[in-house]
Amino acid sequence: MQYLAAYALVALSGKTPSKADVQAVLKAAGVAVDASRVDAVFQEVEGKSFDALVAEGRTKLVGSGSAAPAGAVSTAGAGAGAVAEAKKEEPEEEEADDDMGFGLFD
């Protein structure tokens, strides 16, 4: 992911990304650069414009993003009783710690 992000940073700067540019970005971020991984990124994006890569990525995010809220709703409904019980217990703890023995504003 770091390698693709470095590629994107170079592309967003207005330059056509080169392997040297991507390696420079990675080194600036403190990443130990693996030349074979840089080569793999460039093989995957070969012949594609950056805009096409972004569009392809968005379709994948939409596909996986729509499933997440449905799962979150079902788990939130199942644990609602536990959340209510936890909220009931919290005020007791807060009341015991409010003064902490100082009594500055009595």
Swiss-Prot record:
It holds the Pfam family Ribosomal_60s. Phosphorylated. The gene is LIP. Plays an important role in the elongation step of protein synthesis. This is Large ribosomal subunit protein P2. GO terms for biological process: cytoplasmic translational elongation. Residues 79-106 are annotated as: Disordered. Residues 91-100 have a biased composition (Acidic residues). Keywords: Phosphoprotein, Ribonucleoprotein, Ribosomal protein.
